[in-house]
């Protein structure tokens, strides 16, 4: 995978952490990891250094609150200052469902919190990254194949298979992830003329700390996932990161506005 530029990853656990480590292993020259908790981001940056393959690899950490515009712009400005440019950006910030209820009993406060982080946060991050990348010099996607054009950057949002199907008792999550798909599509359309690609990965159940906690709280959840997924197992965060690496790389130079479902076949037969 030809990933020789610099990366900016939001999210220091689960999918975000897996993406950061994958970028380091695939040879990026530098990375900035952002998280609400600076200590968590710093720990991932240190781990990236231990796995990096670029001889002059650089890894830094920065705090970010995706719900606050000033925080997002400051974090992105810091990453740009440290790295010189941002070639690959991944937004993995998000919150899961705390109260699962049918629509008649659904929590308005949780709905609003879900949208503040998962939707408004995605919008602010995508907006800020788009503005920054527009100022960057275009670089050839593949010098050996000029027809692939030039790039000012790639953005990958972490969505969900819930952006395509509904799940009983989870209207807040379903609605929020449908919105992420919409933001990704519109951003891709607006940014195409600037040489900026915008895509998303949309997994179903992934083995992350958030899902493991849910499985601890709901003992039958593991068995339910196993039965619901045609491939018969939960996804690894590393498998989602593999898809992000592809979408970030020159191999996906013609992919923009793509919302890649990674669900082991779940949405083929049922809800998530």
UniProtKB/Swiss-Prot annotation:
GO terms for molecular function: oxidoreductase activity. The keyword NADP applies. Pfam families: adh_short_C2. The keyword DNA-binding does not apply. NADP(+) binds at residues 15, 65, 127, 173, 177, 206, 208. The active site is at residues 173, 177. Keywords: NADP, Oxidoreductase. Gene3D superfamilies: NAD(P)-binding Rossmann-like Domain. Its EC number is 1.1.1.-. Belongs to the short-chain dehydrogenases/reductases (SDR) family. Short-chain dehydrogenase; part of the gene cluster that mediates the biosynthesis of sordarial, a salicylic aldehyde structurally related to the phytotoxin pyriculol. The most interesting aspect of this pathway is formation of an aromatic product from the highly reducing polyketide synthase srdA. SrdA synthesizes a reduced polyketide chain from one molecule of acetyl-CoA and five molecules of malonyl-CoA. The polyketide chain is then reductively released as an aldehyde. This is Short-chain dehydrogenase srdC.
């Amino acid at each position: 995978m030809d990933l020789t530029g610099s990366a900016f990853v939001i999210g220091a656990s689960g999918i975000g952490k897996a993406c950061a480590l994958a970028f380091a292993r695939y040879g990026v020259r530098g990375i900035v990891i952002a998280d609400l908790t600076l200590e968590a981001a710093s720990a991932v940056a240190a781990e990236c250094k231990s796995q990096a393959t670029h001889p002059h690899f650089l890894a830094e950490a920065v705090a970010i609150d995706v719900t606050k515009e000033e925080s997002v712009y400051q974090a992105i400005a810091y990453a740009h200052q440290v790295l010189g440019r941002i070639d690959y950006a991944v937004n993995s910030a998000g919150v899961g469902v705390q109260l699962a209820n049918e629509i008649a009993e659904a929590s308005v406060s949780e709905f609003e919190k879900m949208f503040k982080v998962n939707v408004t946060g995605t919008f602010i991050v995508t907006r800020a990254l788009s503005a920054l990348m527009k100022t960057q010099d275009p670089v050839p996607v593949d010098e050996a194949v000029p027809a692939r054009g030039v790039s000012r950057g790639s953005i990958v949002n972490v969505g969900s298979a819930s952006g395509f199907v509904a799940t009983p008792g989870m209207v807040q999550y379903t609605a929020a992830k449908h919105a992420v798909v919409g933001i990704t599509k519109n951003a891709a359309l607006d940014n195409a003329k600037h040489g900026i690609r915008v895509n998303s990965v949309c997994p179903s159940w992934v083995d992350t700390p958030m899902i493991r906690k849910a499985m601890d709280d709901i003992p039958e959840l593991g068995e339910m996932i196993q039965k619901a997924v045609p491939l018969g197992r939960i996804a690894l965060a590393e498998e989602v990161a593999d898809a992000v690496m592809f979408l970030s790389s020159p191999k996906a130079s013609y992919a923009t506005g793509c919302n890649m479902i990674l669900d082991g076949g779940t949405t083929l037969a049922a809800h998530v």
